[in-house]
């Protein structure tokens, strides 16, 4: 494993640990998800350039488009939650409440 791939896998693991241990605000969870998607995008783009295959050349762009959709949906849920509950605390969000 090269130094650069180790760096991106460490960034992914830090985002994953931040997502599992930081359970107070919805915004911090969304930022951890975005960091994970960014590290996956860069690692996938580097993998495609190292292998020099045309078969997977569109995979990083597809991942980037899906992460942009995820970011837009997450921000809209954040705004809806902040308007409905007054804060973005994850403890206040319970799917069993009306």
Curated annotation (Swiss-Prot):
Any one annotated GO CC term: mitochondrial membrane
Keyword terms, alphabetized: Electron transport, Membrane, Mitochondrion, NAD, Respiratory chain, Translocase, Transmembrane, Transmembrane helix, Transport, Ubiquinone
Reaction(s) catalysed by this chain's protein: a ubiquinone + NADH + 5 H(+)(in) = a ubiquinol + NAD(+) + 4 H(+)(out)
Major subcellular location class: mitochondrion
Pfam families recorded: Oxidored_q2
E.C. number: 7.1.1.2
Membrane topology: Multi-pass membrane protein
InterPro entries per UniProt: NADH_UbQ_OxRdtase_chain4L/K (IPR001133), NUOK/Mnh_C1-like (IPR039428)
Molecular function terms, GO-annotated: NADH dehydrogenase (ubiquinone) activity
Cell location: Mitochondrion membrane
Domain of life: Eukaryota
Transmembrane segments: 1-21, 26-46, 59-79
GO BP term (any one): ATP synthesis coupled electron transport
Family, similarity comment: Belongs to the complex I subunit 4L family.
Function, as annotated: Core subunit of the mitochondrial membrane respiratory chain NADH dehydrogenase (Complex I) which catalyzes electron transfer from NADH through the respiratory chain, using ubiquinone as an electron acceptor. Part of the enzyme membrane arm which is embedded in the lipid bilayer and involved in proton translocation.
Protein name: NADH-ubiquinone oxidoreductase chain 4L
Gene: MT-ND4L
């Amino acid at each position: 494993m090269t130094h650069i791939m180790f760096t991106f896998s460490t960034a992914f693991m830090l985002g994953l640990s931040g997502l599992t241990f930081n359970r107070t605000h919805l915004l911090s969870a969304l930022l951890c998800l975005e960091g994970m998607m960014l590290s996956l995008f860069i690692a996938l783009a580097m993998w495609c350039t190292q292998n020099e295959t045309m078969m997977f050349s569109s995979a990083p762009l597809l991942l980037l488009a899906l992460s942009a959709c995820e970011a837009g949906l997450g921000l809209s849920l954040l705004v809806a939650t902040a308007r409905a509950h007054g804060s973005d605390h994850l403890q206040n969000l319970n799917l069993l409440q009306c």
